[in-house]
Amino acid sequence: MMSKYPLLGMTLIELQSLVKRLGMPGFAAKQIASWLYDKKVTSIDEMTNLSLKYRELLKQNYEVGAEAPVEEMRSVDGTVKYLYPVGENHFVESVYIPDDERATLCISSQVGCKMNCKFCMTGKQGYSANLTAHQIINQIHSLPERDKLTNVVMMGMGEPLDNLEEVLKALDILTGSYGYAWSPKRITVSTVGLRKGLRRFIEESDCHLAISLHSPVTAQRAELMPAEKAFSITEMVELLKNYDFSKQRRLSFEYIVFKGLNDSQVYAKELLKLLRGLDCRMNLIRFHSIPGVALEGADMDTMTRFRDYLTTHGLFTTIRASRGEDIFAACGMLSTAKQEENNKS
């Protein structure tokens, strides 16, 4: 039996093309979008302002396509990690992070990752597949706590700019008036920085941008992050200087502080020199140990001194709270054990 195509994850333009192809009236595209993204239905039968004839026509080859998570793990700090199926024998993880008045969902954009960053478990898993816009949006649509969400960060498994077409479609659905109608200020996309995709992302999306930096020294960054060899951080900064981040859109840099590696004042000074002239902020992140990686995280005193030095010299810097470490849901720790099981079987 042929599987049906999901409506979830279709942009308004795609829905308009679909209804035209099926001989439905043009206004049906916005009606379907409203059912999917505003009313968040799970079946075509619920789309009651479409005639029975058109609902039956849609159901011949299409379905909403909502897929609930198949597993969940709960941390002592309230963080919840969800496992979603994304095609045959493929899975991704999303992390729900409640925090007082805010609730953030960290979503994935790929199964695995090609970037092979030294400090990241997803990179150790290798790359398997790009997620479709449907599979990206489903992580939000099918989240049990969906109605509590205030923010989405694309900082889960995968490199978003390596799957730019589907990521941009998902962002269009999240921010478009026909879709979830979220302000772009509620969404942050994190990237190692790919030459091919960075400029296009900045020009086609208004969402916040976070750059994985981790070292201001080219040779050291290349050792930690092979992507540096293709597009250096100095080139990236020069490109970023062509754009205005002084208004509502935020540019931030992510910096894991490693013990004895990049945690001295020398590195803080290099960061200030590298980022001079950019309207940006710095997020310091504690390293979470992963198997087979001989790196250690700096202690909190060192991180605090590092933060204070940057802040007093004009670079607004915060230390990101570490959440979900006990369930392997913290930064750099996402890697689906389920995927590994299937790969071995």
Swiss-Prot record:
GO terms for molecular function: 4 iron, 4 sulfur cluster binding; metal ion binding; rRNA (adenine(2503)-C2-)-methyltransferase activity; rRNA binding; tRNA (adenine(37)-C2)-methyltransferase activity; tRNA binding. PROSITE patterns: RADICAL_SAM. Keywords: 4Fe-4S, Cytoplasm, Disulfide bond, Iron, Iron-sulfur, Metal-binding, Methyltransferase, rRNA processing, S-adenosyl-L-methionine, Transferase, tRNA processing. S-adenosyl-L-methionine binds at residues 158-159, 190, 212-214, 288. It catalyses: adenosine(2503) in 23S rRNA + 2 reduced [2Fe-2S]-[ferredoxin] + 2 S-adenosyl-L-methionine = 2-methyladenosine(2503) in 23S rRNA + 5'-deoxyadenosine + L-methionine + 2 oxidized [2Fe-2S]-[ferredoxin] + S-adenosyl-L-homocysteine; adenosine(37) in tRNA + 2 reduced [2Fe-2S]-[ferredoxin] + 2 S-adenosyl-L-methionine = 2-methyladenosine(37) in tRNA + 5'-deoxyadenosine + L-methionine + 2 oxidized [2Fe-2S]-[ferredoxin] + S-adenosyl-L-homocysteine. CDD domains: Radical_SAM. It is found in: Cytoplasm. One of its GO terms (cellular component) is cytoplasm. Binds 1 [4Fe-4S] cluster. The cluster is coordinated with 3 cysteines and an exchangeable S-adenosyl-L-methionine. Its main location: cytoplasm. Disulfide bonds join 106-331. Its cofactor is [4Fe-4S] cluster. Residues 99-326 form the Radical SAM core domain. [4Fe-4S] cluster binds at residues 113, 117, 120. One of its GO terms (biological process) is rRNA base methylation. The keyword Transport does not apply. The keyword Acetylation does not apply. Its EC number is 2.1.1.192. InterPro entries: Aldolase_TIM, Methyltransferase_A, RlmN_N, RNA_MTrfase_RlmN, rRNA_lsu_MTrfase_RlmN/Cfr, rSAM. Specifically methylates position 2 of adenine 2503 in 23S rRNA and position 2 of adenine 37 in tRNAs. Reaction proceeds by a ping-pong mechanism involving intermediate methylation of a conserved cysteine residue. This is Probable dual-specificity RNA methyltransferase RlmN.
